[in-house]
Amino acid sequence: MAIVGLGTDIAEIERVEKALARSGVAFAERILSVQEMETFVSLKQQGRFLAKRFAAKEAASKALGTGIAHGVSFQDFTIKNDDNGKPYLQLAGRAAELAHQMGVCHTHLSLSDERHYAVATVIFES
């Protein structure tokens, strides 16, 4: 196995919270998948959840080498959690096509947050 993609992103939680307050659910719908929205609407700390998802999706798009462009959208990525709470990445659409072209067989996602920031790192392995 070899690393074929690496991406990292950091999001300021307060900035995401302000965007959410300004644009409401429309901002969240632009970033989150349908499955993620189902979780989002039930949370008290929506801004923190959204900041972590935003950072993860930006990191994943950087690992693809495209960023959120060239047909890759936030909706192409869904962040889920396994039975132990470990986050993992599910790809769809153009992101899945590009990952296949890169020979990606394994994805790794690390998420962390503290008072002011959320950070994510994504590694794609062939």
Swiss-Prot record:
Top EC class for this record: transferase
What GO annotations for molecular function exist for this entry?
holo-[acyl-carrier-protein] synthase activity; magnesium ion binding
Where in or outside the cell is it found? Cytoplasm
- A Gene Ontology biological process term: lysine biosynthetic process via aminoadipic acid
Q: Which Gene3D superfamilies match?
A: 4'-phosphopantetheinyl transferase domain
Required co-factors? Mg(2+)
- Enzyme Commission number(s) from the entry: 2.7.8.7
GO cellular component entries: cytosol
Q: What InterPro entries does this protein map onto?
A: 4-PPantetheinyl_Trfase_dom, 4-PPantetheinyl_Trfase_dom_sf, ACPS, P-Pant_transferase_sf, Ppantetheine-prot_Trfase_dom
- The source's superkingdom equals Bacteria
Q: Which UniProt keywords apply?
A: Cytoplasm, Fatty acid biosynthesis, Fatty acid metabolism, Lipid biosynthesis, Lipid metabolism, Magnesium, Metal-binding, Transferase
Record's catalysed reaction(s): apo-[ACP] + CoA = holo-[ACP] + adenosine 3',5'-bisphosphate + H(+)
Please provide an example of a Pfam family that matches this protein in its UniProt record: ACPS
Q: What SUPFAM superfamilies is this protein classified in? A: 4'-phosphopantetheinyl transferase
| Residues reported in the UniProt entry to bind Mg(2+) | 9, 58
Question: Which family does this protein fall into?
Answer: Belongs to the P-Pant transferase superfamily. AcpS family.
Instruction: Say what the protein does.
Output: Transfers the 4'-phosphopantetheine moiety from coenzyme A to a Ser of acyl-carrier-protein.
Query: What is the recorded name of this protein?
Result: Holo-[acyl-carrier-protein] synthase
Q: Which gene encodes it?
A: acpS
